[in-house]
């Protein structure tokens, strides 16, 4: 008998949609013309993205999107340094982190503890553990002392959006 499922990494499409949803930007409208996914700040579901067979999107290729000009019964998952560089420096990730930070700091009176709790609810749909809450509050308290509230919360949001918990299904 199996008592648990092996961890699996989300496909890039589901991961992109999860980040857009956490940032409150995912456009759930049905139908319509396909659009470039990572250009012009497209926030439609990835399902509606335009795929060019001769020139697939660089971000999709980076995260194991199959060659659209050939049959691919499964994807060969890879892990590369470029993937983590995208998480740390990619314009898409930075925009999502800023948008999530805007949601978390909409109330100027929000305490670091409130921000951490709201962030975990939005990103992971759960409450943070005591350790996660303590570490998040300590980080935010130290960063907020610099007076750059939005930037501090955006960095925290980016760390959560780039975490394994969002990328993998347990």
Predicted regions and their residues:
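Amphipathic alpha-helical segments that form the core helices of the histone-fold
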Residues: 134-144
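Globin-like tetrapyrrole-binding proteins
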Residues: 156
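Amphipathic alpha-helical segments in structured regions that serve as interaction surfaces
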Residues: 115, 119, 135-136, 152
């Amino acid at each position: 008998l199996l008592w648990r499922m092996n961890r699996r990494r989300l496909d890039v499409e589901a991961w992109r949609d999860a980040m857009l949803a956490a940032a409150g930007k995912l456009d759930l409208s049905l139908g319509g013309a396909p659009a470039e996914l990572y250009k012009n700040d497209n926030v439609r579901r990835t399902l509606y993205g335009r795929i060019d067979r001769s020139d697939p999107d660089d971000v999709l290729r980076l995260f194991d999107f199959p060659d659209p000009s050939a049959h691919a019964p499964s994807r060969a998952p890879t892990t590369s340094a470029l993937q983590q560089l995208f998480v740390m420096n990619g314009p898409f990730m930075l925009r999502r982190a800023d948008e999530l930070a805007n949601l978390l700091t909409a109330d100027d009176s929000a305490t670091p503890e409130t921000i951490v709790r709201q962030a975990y609810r939005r990103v992971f749909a759960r409450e943070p553990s005591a350790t996660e809450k303590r570490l998040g509050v300590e980080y935010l308290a130290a960063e907020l002392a610099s007076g750059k509230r939005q930037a501090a919360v955006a960095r925290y949001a980016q760390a959560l959006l780039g975490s394994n918990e969002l990328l993998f299904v347990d």
